Regions:
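Membrane-interface interhelical linkers
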Residues: 1-11, 27, 40-67, 79-88, ...
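Juxtamembrane helix-loop-helix junctions in multi-pass membrane proteins
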Residues: 15-39, 57
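Hydrophobic/aromatic residues within transmembrane alpha-helices
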Residues: 23, 32, 85, 111-113
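Helix-helix packing/entry segments at the starts of transmembrane helices
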Residues: 31-38, 80, 87-106
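C-terminal transmembrane-helix exit sites in multi-pass transporters
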Residues: 102-122
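Hydrophobic/small/kink-forming positions within alpha-helical transmembrane segments
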Residues: 10, 14, 18, 45, ...
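Hydrophobic residues within alpha-helical transmembrane segments
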Residues: 4, 8-11, 35-39, 66, ...
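Hydrophobic transmembrane alpha-helices of multi-pass small-molecule transport proteins
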Residues: 44, 120-136
Length: 137
């Protein structure tokens, strides 16, 4: 099931890039990111209430709160950078650079989460890096 969810995420992320590039034309990139954020917040809380998951908020640990807040700040910074880059650059160049986050995530997961960095991971990172370079040059 995780594979199909990840694939769905990739499809929706691709749609996000195209829809954002069209929608951001003539709009301040920070304002566009804020509008997107409001939509995401409403949708996320709608799903929380629809699935009756709101009761779980009481059992979230202080550590989880800290890391969820930090993750939210990182998401906000990412979206602000992404929207500005998308506004001034070509989607076909901005999106591949943005997807270097895969490589950065693998490296950070190795350093901070002590996840395995296998030969396959290294080769994959190199291929993603080389592919990104090929797409943006």
């Amino acid at each position: 099931m995780w594979f199909w969810l990840a694939l769905g995420s990739a499809v929706f992320a691709a749609l996000t890039s195209i829809l954002a590039k069209i929608g951001i034309e003539g709009v301040n990139s920070n304002l566009a990111a804020a509008i997107r954020t409001v939509v995401v917040v409403v949708m996320a809380w709608g799903i929380v209430f629809l699935t009756n998951a709101q009761g779980g908020i009481k059992s979230i640990s202080q550590r989880s709160w800290i890391f969820l807040i930090l993750s939210g700040l990182a998401t906000g910074a990412s979206w602000l950078c992404y929207y500005k880059a998308l506004q001034v650059g070509e989607a076909s160049k901005v999106v591949p650079i943005d997807k270097l986050s895969v490589v950065i995530t693998l490296v950070l997961a190795f350093i901070f989460l002590h996840e395995q960095f296998t030969a396959k991971s290294v080769i994959g990172c190199l291929l993603i890096g080389a592919g990104t370079l090929m797409m943006v040059l």
